A protein has these predicted regions:
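Acidic, glycine-rich two-metal-ion catalytic cores of nucleic acid-processing enzymes
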Residues: 128-197
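N-terminal leader/targeting and assembly helices and adjacent pre-domain segments
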Residues: 1-134, 138-145
Length: 197
């Protein structure tokens, strides 16, 4: 819930900034003119989600800890931090890239008309805030958790993929479960190294 609200806050701030830009500028023809370069754009989302993603990754690391003595929160945090780049990349592919693609299409569709572009931007951000965030944020949280769990695995640890028979159907999860016990750092049959499938 918190991650969803944080993401929606970034989207709202970003939309307001874009609309201000469109009111006070010459014709906008490039994506960078309204949201900045991709790396800069991605940092806004990664920064907003970082505390929640770190907590999810640490929880994942804690879930697969198998030695007799529970490591300190610091040790778990250090292990999970090794996955932060991969988690950030998932945020980019889940939110930033699709959003940039939609905005880029809107710029092309507006053909230099800032008023038309403003209308299209409102539609894009409304869709993201009302629909896409809710569809995307759970996968991001699950991926952070899964990456945290992956961080504490060693190549000699045996792991099995389990799926919830009462949960939604997932062919990849079922295929992965058929592989049985595998070395902890090996990819499952579908290519996944961690949940979710």
């Amino acid at each position: 819930l918190t991650m969803g609200r944080k993401t929606k806050r970034v989207l709202a701030d970003e939309q307001n900034q874009i609309l201000d830009t469109l009111r006070g500028r010459a014709v906008v023809k490039t994506l960078d003119a309204i949201v900045g370069p991709k790396a800069e754009h991605a940092k806004r989302y990664s920064a907003a989600l970082a505390p929640s993603l770190k907590s999810a990754a640490v929880a994942g690391a804690r879930s697969l800890h198998t030695t007799g003595v529970m490591p300190s929160d610091r040790e778990l945090s250090d292990a999970a931090a090794k996955q932060s780049k991969a988690i950030d990349e998932f945020v980019v592919t889940s939110i930033v890239e699709p959003l940039r693609e939609r905005l880029s299409r809107s710029i092309s569709q507006a053909s230099g008309d800032n008023a038309e572009l403003a209308k299209l931007v409102r539609v894009v951000y409304r869709e993201w805030k009302n629909q896409m965030v809710d569809e995307t944020i759970d996968d991001i949280a699950y991926t952070a958790y899964g990456r945290g769990a992956l961080a504490v695995l060693t190549p000699d640890m045996k792991v099995c993929w389990k799926f919830d028979p009462a949960g939604p159907a997932c062919a990849d999860a079922e295929d992965n479960s058929l592989a049985g016990a595998m070395n902890g750092c090996d990819a499952f049959p579908t290519g996944h190294t961690h949940a979710p499938a």
